[in-house]
Amino acid sequence: LDFVDKIIGISSDVEFEHFDPGKLVPTLEALDAVSSGSVDAAYATSGYWQGKINSASLFAAVPFGPEAGEFMGWILYDDGAALWQEMYDTNGYNVVATPCGVIAPETSGWFKNEINGVEDLEGLNMRFFGLGAKVMEKVGVSTSLLSAGDIFPALERGAIDATEFSMPKIDARLGFHKIAKFNYFPGWHQPSTLFELLINKDVYEELTDVAKKQIEVACLANITTNLAEGEATNYAAMVDNVENNGVTLKQWSPEMLALFEEKWNEVAAELADGDPFFQKVWADMQEYRAGYKVWSNNIYLPRN
C-alpha cells in the first residue's frame, strides 16, 4: 500500500503495518472493526458502507458527479472533509476519517455480451459498487457488492453475469478480461473515487500532534501519486486488452447515458427525501458544484 510506504518514510512518531484485504477482517466489516478497536486502522473507500449509511458513497464516488480535481476541492477547501467526519460521528462510529487517496475514472463494467439497449441489461446479475448500484437496479439489473477477491470466482461459476470494479490497470490484475470480453466506458458511476484512512478515535487521540500531522501529510502525498498513476498507466492496460486479450472497448450511447443519469436523479431525490443527512451533504455538494462551474466552464478547453 503506497500510504504505508509514505508514512514509514516520513514518520518519527507513528508506525503502520500493512495487511492485505481480508487478512485481519473481511473488507466489508472494516469500519465496524476499526470503530470497535478490533483493528487500529483501515484504508478503504466509504462506498463499502453504503448498506450501513446512505450518505457514505457521497464521500466515495457520485454518479455523474465531480471528477478528481473538483471532488478534492470540495473535500479539502470546502465543507467535504468536515461533513465526512460528521457522518461517522452522527452514526455512532468511533473513528477519525482522513481523506487519503483518489483515483481516476473507472470503467463502466465488464460484460459477457454486447449491450445494445436497456433490454440487454434486464435480468443480469452484476457486481456493482455504491450509489451506481441503485441506478442499475432501476434499469432491471440485480446487483451485489463483492470484495475484489470474490469477483472473478463469481464470474467464472456464473453467479454474476457482469462486473465493475476499478480502472483498467487494476481490473487487469483481477482477470476479468478472461471471461467478460466487452468493456464499457465511460464510468458514469465513478467519475473519480475517494479513499479514506480510518483510525480508531481512541487510538488517534493518543497520538502526538506531530504524528497526526505526519499522517495528514502522507495522505496528501498519497492523493497526489494515486491520481498521477491513474492518469499515466491505464491506457497501456486498455491497449493490451484489445491487442492481446480479445477485449472490445465499447462506449455507452448518448441514449443509454441519458437513461442512467435520469435514473440517478431519481435515486438521489429518493435518498434525500428519506434521509436528512444525505439531503444536507447532497445540497452542500450541489451548491459547491454550481460555483465550481463558473470556473470550469470558462477556464478549460472543450474536451471533445
What role is predicted for each listed range?
Residues 1-71, 86-304:
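N-terminal secretory/targeting leader peptides
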